[in-house]
Amino acid sequence: MGSKGLKGVMVCLLILGLVLEHVQVEGKSCCRSTLGRNCYNLCRVRGAQKLCANACRCKLTSGLKCPSSFPKLALVSNSDEPDTIDYCNLGCRASMCDYMVNAAADDEEMKLYVEHCSDACVNFCNGDVGLTSLTA
């Protein structure tokens, strides 16, 4: 793996670490609808939890279950939104793997980057983040 590829992997790991920290915080907010969930997620990029929950009509909770009137729990695989993992994979691949493809020197290196990056995204979105998937 060339030095450009190693730098790309390191950038990917750093960003995934930052996103993972952010995801753990969002697991404690419940929204009435997918629109409310999307509003909350967008707001949380820069806004505080309480401010975003109020603005998007969501509710903060300390448990893993949402009240029946607030069924949309963020990024929990057994919530009412099983597609969150698919959206996570798609977003991760679009943002991280595209960068790595552009850093590849040749087709063989590009295939290797895409394979490792896709595996890392799947592991990240399923909650199994580990360095072994990138260094294998």
From Swiss-Prot:
One of its GO terms (molecular function) is toxin activity. Residues 73-136 form a propeptide. Disulfide bonds join 30-66, 31-58, 39-56, 43-52. It is found in: Secreted. The keyword Mitochondrion does not apply. Belongs to the plant thionin (TC 1.C.44) family. 4 C-C subfamily. This is Beta-hordothionin. It comes from Hordeum vulgare.
